[in-house]
A protein has these predicted regions:
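N-terminal cap/lid segment of alpha/beta-hydrolase-fold proteins
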Residues: 27-54
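Mobile cap/lid helix-loop segments that gate and shape the active-site cleft of serine hydrolases
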Residues: 38, 177-214, 220
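Short beta-strand element of the alpha/beta-hydrolase
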Residues: 56-64
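Catalytic nucleophile-loop/oxyanion-hole region of alpha/beta-hydrolase
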Residues: 71-73, 78, 94-141, 270-275
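C-terminal catalytic histidine-bearing segment of alpha/beta-hydrolase fold enzymes
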Residues: 101, 108, 239-312, 316-317
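Primarily recognizes the serine-hydrolase "nucleophile elbow" in alpha/beta-hydrolase
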Residues: 125-189, 206
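Short beta-strand/loop motif that positions the catalytic acidic residue
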Residues: 218, 224-226, 230
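Conserved alpha/beta-hydrolase "acid-adjacent" motif
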Residues: 231-239
């Protein structure tokens, strides 16, 4: 048996081994920003910052999850760290969703729960917060955009279609987005998640929240991407939005990859090598958008099969590109 002295020595040695690891972990764990201080939702909604400093561009990231839950990995933390590596400050928004119990129990026939416009109010508040704290976080207020994945892409577009123009982000990045609530290609789970069981078939509400129907004049530039083989959100959603942006002469770039599926986010392993090229394409688009004097750190990634341009007008900001891989 160990003597008391030996036992104490081993405990001290163990603590000396573990504490530096815990301290390092605590230092690398991003803080959470309370954007609804003093309200009943302050513990359910927050921003997680990944700061780049140097008066950087900022992107508020809306993870997807059918308005029922969040993918805080590939569409959250990994997206934040990727943007930060490329000198873009990211703020990952955990917005209100219906959550799993509402998905399973359908209790929103009787109770309100979380539903529209809760998530939009959270995004609106996050835009206000980042702008008002721009000096503290060292971001440029003229270069604050919104990125959204899947249902988060619907939320990102809602910021320019449903908020006052004075509160619009400067650019929007919908990635494999949910777009329509009226077309046969709609993603029904996202519609139910956003509207609730008692309102998901309300025609007027569904129409007003179909992003392809309400693209505003002078809409900020949009970078739109999806995959033709998406098994979750039908690829036609993005095509509807692309057509609407084109009809409104909105400066945008649309890339549709042949393979990649859904939910790859900013992951280095999910999806396909082909679809993961969207990150490099986006960085180049953003660099051109703001005509940076300092170059973004755009790292070339593995080369996909060649893309062909289906529709292209040469000069930005009127560039409209539809890429399809062959």
């Amino acid at each position: 048996m160990l003597t008391q002295r030996a036992h104490s020595f081993l405990c001290a040695l163990l603590m000396l081994t573990i504490l530096p690891t815990l301290a390092a972990s605590a230092q690398t764990q991003p803080e959470r920003i309370d954007i609804w201080s003093g309200t009943s939702v302050r513990h359910r909604v927050w921003l997680t910052p990944y700061l780049a400093g140097a008066n950087s561009t900022a992107v508020i990231v809306c993870p997807g999850g059918s308005y029922f839950w969040h993918d805080m990995d590939a569409e959250g933390e990994q997206a934040g760290r990727w943007l930060q590596r490329h000198r873009i400050s990211a703020f990952i928004l955990r917005y209100r969703t219906a959550y799993v119990p509402a998905f399973v129990l359908h209790y929103r026939w009787l109770l309100r729960g979380n539903r529209y416009p809760d998530a939009l109010n959270d995004l609106r508040q996050s835009l206000r917060y980042v702008r008002s704290h721009a000096k503290e976080y060292d971001v440029d207020t003229t270069r604050i955009g919104v990125m959204g994945f899947s249902a988060g892409g619907h939320l990102a577009m809602s910021a320019v279609e449903l908020l006052p123009r004075t509160e619009w982000p400067k650019f929007v990045i919908p990635v494999y987005p949910v777009v329509t609530f009226v077309d046969p290609c709609m993603h029904k789970r996202s519609r139910r998640g956003l509207l609730g069981d008692s309102r998901e078939h309300n025609r007027r509400l569904c129409d007003s929240l179909s992003m392809e129907r309400h693209v505003p004049e002078n809409c900020p530039p949009v970078f739109l991407v999806n995959c033709h083989d998406d098994p979750i959100v039908h690829y036609h959603n993005a095509e509807l939005l692309d057509s609407a942006l084109t009809a409104r002469h909105v400066p945008h770039q649309y890339i549709q990859y042949r393979t990649g599926g859904h939910g790859f986010g900013a992951s280095e392993v999910k999806g396909t090598a082909e679809c993961r090229q969207w990150k490099t394409a986006f960085l180049k688009w953003l660099q051109e958008l703001f005509s940076y004097h300092e170059s973004l750190e755009v790292r070339e990634e593995e080369d996909p099969r060649p893309c062909v341009c289906a529709d292209h007008v040469s000069s930005y900001p009127e560039t409209h590109v539809l890429y399809r891989t062959v």
